[in-house]
Amino acid sequence: MKVVITGHMNGLGLVLSNKFVQKGYTISGYDLNNDKDVIKEDTINELITDCTDADIFVNNAHANQSSLLTQVFKLWEGMDKTIINISSAITYITPRNLPESLNEYISDKKNLDTTVKLLRMKSELPHIMNIRPSWIETQLVSEFNTKKINPDDIANLIVMLYNMRYAVKILDIVLEK
């Protein structure tokens, strides 16, 4: 089985990649740190081509998520494959006193959640799991003085939910510590 994952070299993406490798999956990763920036057209084309024989697409990197989700969905429409979409609990809860630097992030994640809902209305397949964790223990949010979820716990949950995709339909999971 093959997993295509964005943002696979840090944080949740790194931990999730390692979990899938431990389960015997082949990983094809896209990350700024391996010169596979998912906002560049040549990288996007490579990713879409890579998804033709993949079973799972983990839409983890913040950049270009809605566009990638839509393109992979169109490629896989009607096929028994799975998109694991990493959104944010920040779209569900009402946070207070957040820095303005997060406004674009919040807007992008809300757009992503809307895109998920619209695509699900088109077809039940591919499966789309929308995972919305709150703050995750990563360097990116180390400056925020708030409770954070261990990325290993989230990755374990995601793998478990993927394995249950035929038993229950996973639509939206909001995780908060």
Which sequence ranges carry the predicted segments?
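Adenosine-cofactor binding site in Rossmann-like domains, unifying the SAM/SAH pocket
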Residues: 27-47, 67
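N-terminal Rossmann NAD(P)H-binding glycine-rich loop of SDR-like oxidoreductase domains
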Residues: 5-22
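Conserved amphipathic alpha-helix within the SDR
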Residues: 42-53, 73-74
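C-terminal helical subdomain
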Residues: 130, 145-177
